[in-house]
Amino acid sequence: MKFAVILLFSLVVLAVASESVEEVRREIDIEDLPEQQRGCADLRQPCTEGDDCSCCGREGVCNCSHPHKKGCYCKTAGPLEKLAKKFKGCKNK
């Protein structure tokens, strides 16, 4: 009986803790921040036209010629695009 009460109490504490973490995530949604505050954009996120460094990682480059989307979005770079980004000396990783 004592074990069941402890287990039930632990589950309640876990549920309350996970709810508060979700609330914080909703409040600080990285997609709602302007790109300058984010530092860099993940793949398939909006980026700055002509600035491959606005996309995170070595794999990301800014693509403004997507056939189904208006605007510029980060995409996975090809081999030559990766090399060009490496020589640009982007600060973000």
UniProtKB/Swiss-Prot annotation:
Query: Under the cellular component aspect of Gene Ontology, which terms does the record hold?
Result: extracellular region
The residues forming a coiled coil are none
Q: Where in the cell is it found?
A: Secreted
- Proregion residues are 19-38
Q: State what protein this is by name.
A: U12-lycotoxin-Ls1c
* Molecular function GO terms recorded: toxin activity
Q: Give the organism the record lists.
A: Lycosa singoriensis
| Alphabetical keyword list | Disulfide bond, Secreted, Signal, Toxin
**For this UniProt entry, what is the primary localization, expressed as one broad class?**
secreted
The residues forming the signal peptide are 1-18
Q: Which family does it belong to?
A: Belongs to the neurotoxin 31 family.
Post-translation changes: Contains 5 disulfide bonds.
Keyword Secreted carried by entry? yes
Q: In which tissues is it expressed?
A: Expressed by the venom gland.
